[in-house]
């Protein structure tokens, strides 16, 4: 190989290395690479919530429901109809809220966007609080959790930063605050899913107890944002919930409220 040919090969090698380095620098600036995928984007809502609530010192029902501390608040666990937020004379259900200043501006925007979808598709309007006694206080404490339904006073919706500030997770916790249970605890769930009790971690079997629910004449919804994922509270990630009759049916949600979730809000609040 003559000198000119060797120089040409060397130049091609240098150009190739330069392009590769440029690609790597661009990936570093963007904070990701082609091989890297945010694992949380692949998780269903319940998996994200349980991961964020892991090691919580607070006793939680069904993984993310804060147990009421007053007799008045207990009513929602016995009679869901009695824990609805009050409706205005114009048919709008106004839910006052405050968002902690400990969130960044983009996190606040994500929260408000999740709330906005309720106003677009239901009669639920989350409105900034003035001086109302009953309101939601969204705070970045440990985990993702909420109380169940209308309490009549300040009630905290916990949305930890760097994990819970996701459209679907926010809507999940807001639905709890509006009075909705997890889908797999429906009174008719045994017709639609099989609970694999032997695969559930011993201390968490109570999270799969059925509730005496009013299903509002709506079908069981595998795609509900309130549905547990297949391996929720499973030993070594074993399957704890199996759809029937089709065991391969997709369950869980990763993006937003399903159409049936929205239908139920409209039915419960007579929108």
Swiss-Prot record:
One BP term from GO: proteolysis
In terms of Gene3D superfamilies, this protein maps to: Collagenase (Catalytic Domain)
Q: Which residues are glycosylated?
A: 30, 54, 211
The record ties this protein, via InterPro entries, to:
MetalloPept_cat_dom_sf, Peptidase_M12A, Peptidase_Metallo, ZnMP_hatching_enz
The catalytic activity, as recorded, is: Hydrolysis of the inner layer of fish egg envelope. Also hydrolysis of casein and small molecule substrates such as succinyl-Leu-Leu-Val-Tyr-|-7-(4-methyl)coumarylamide
Q: What is its main location?
A: other
Family annotation (PANTHER family):
DISCOIDIN, CUB, EGF, LAMININ , AND ZINC METALLOPROTEASE DOMAIN CONTAINING (PTHR10127), HATCHING ENZYME 1.2-RELATED (PTHR10127:SF839)
Q: What is this protein called?
A: Low choriolytic enzyme
What is the protein's species of origin? Oryzias latipes
């Amino acid at each position: 190989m003559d000198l000119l040919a060797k120089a040409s090969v060397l130049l091609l090698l240098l150009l190739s290395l330069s392009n590769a380095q440029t690609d790597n620098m661009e990936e570093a600036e963007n904070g990701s690479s082609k091989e890297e995928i945010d694992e949380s984007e692949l998780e269903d809502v319940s998996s994200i919530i349980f991961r964020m609530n892991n090691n919580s010192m607070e006793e939680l029902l069904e993984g993310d429901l804060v147990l009421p501390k007053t007799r008045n608040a207990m009513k929602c666990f016995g009679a869901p109809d009695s824990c609805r937020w009050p409706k205005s004379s114009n048919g709008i259900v106004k839910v006052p809220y405050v968002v902690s200043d400990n969130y960044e501006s983009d996190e606040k925007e994500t929260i408000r966007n999740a709330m906005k979808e309720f106003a677009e598709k239901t009669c639920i309007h989350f409105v900034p609080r003035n001086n109302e006694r009953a309101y939601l206080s969204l705070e970045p404490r440990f985990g993702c959790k909420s109380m169940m339904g209308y309490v009549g006073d300040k009630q905290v919706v916990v949305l930890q930063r760097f994990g819970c500030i996701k459209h679907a997770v926010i809507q999940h916790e807001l639905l709890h605050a509006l009075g909705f249970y997890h889908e797999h605890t429906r009174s008719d769930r045994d017709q639609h899913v099989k609970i694999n009790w032997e695969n559930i971690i011993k201390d968490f079997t109570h999270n799969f107890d059925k509730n005496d629910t009013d299903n509002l004449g709506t079908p069981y919804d595998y795609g509900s944002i309130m549905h547990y994922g297949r391996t929720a509270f499973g030993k070594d990630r074993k399957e704890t919930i199996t759809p029937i009759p089709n065991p391969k049916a997709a369950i869980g949600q990763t993006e937003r409220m399903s159409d049936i979730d929205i239908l139920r809000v409209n039915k419960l609040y007579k929108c």
